[in-house]
Amino acid sequence: MTRKKWSFLFTVCLVTALIGCGQKNSQVDKNNSEELNKLGQIQVISREEGSGTRDTFASLAGFNKDGADGIDKTVNTATIADSMDSVIETVNKNPSAIGYVSAGTIGIDGVKTLEINGEAVSDNKGKYPLTRSFYLAYSGTLNDVEQDFMTYVQSVGQEIVSGHYETIAKNATFLSNQSEGTIRIEGSTSMAALMKEIADAYMKINTHATIQVTATDSTKGLNSVMSGNCEMAMSSRDLKDYEKELLNYNTVAKDKIAVIVNQKNPLSDITLYMLKSI
């Protein structure tokens, strides 16, 4: 499949009148059309299959093939990145690139976020369309140290969550039971940095516990906890029906998926319709 050009995208924006692309008048439109034409072909940067961010992005943007559990319609010319950092690095270096990452990672020079349907990723009114939950999933019943950690995550740990994401509960007091044990947590790269920060803070309170956080992807993490190779899985997507039957899970944070482009790209706004088009 031939990659579309940025100038084509802008032309469609104007013709359909579905999006203003962040522009204020016809002169700006003309200038942006010229700048977009210089960018050439659009290079889509996508996460790998199994990524919770990819799964959720495809679902929310409306290009799953066969419903919520279907294969998504990510363009076959997309460059595949195996982590958020890789997406950001690629977009940073390529003026014609567009990608998507957890909004909690934004702030790196060289990339900018696009408004979606006129709503900024910083919107706190609940109107931003690419919003999801972060989950910790586990099999069976939590043991003492696992329950202690989960309680921490959903209480005092929410203060750490609030630094980058939307909390799921008000901060509450926490008194550790000082249980001993090791908790292996695997899964989403979008969640890994947050969970490492929470785990480090918890281990200062409960010095008898050891928590190991390994970033793979949501699907690998869920498969790992189902097979008994770890105690908890980080999932940045909703669990599928069969996973819900086999696992228990708790919400630990709310996140937004940001669509990012290079700073040289003149666009500031895009719609879900246009995302599907590219």
Positions of the model-derived regions?
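Sec-dependent N-terminal signal peptides of Gram-positive bacterial secreted proteins and lipoproteins
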Residues: T2-N25
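Exported/periplasmic ABC-transporter solute-binding proteins
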Residues: C21-E231, S235-I278
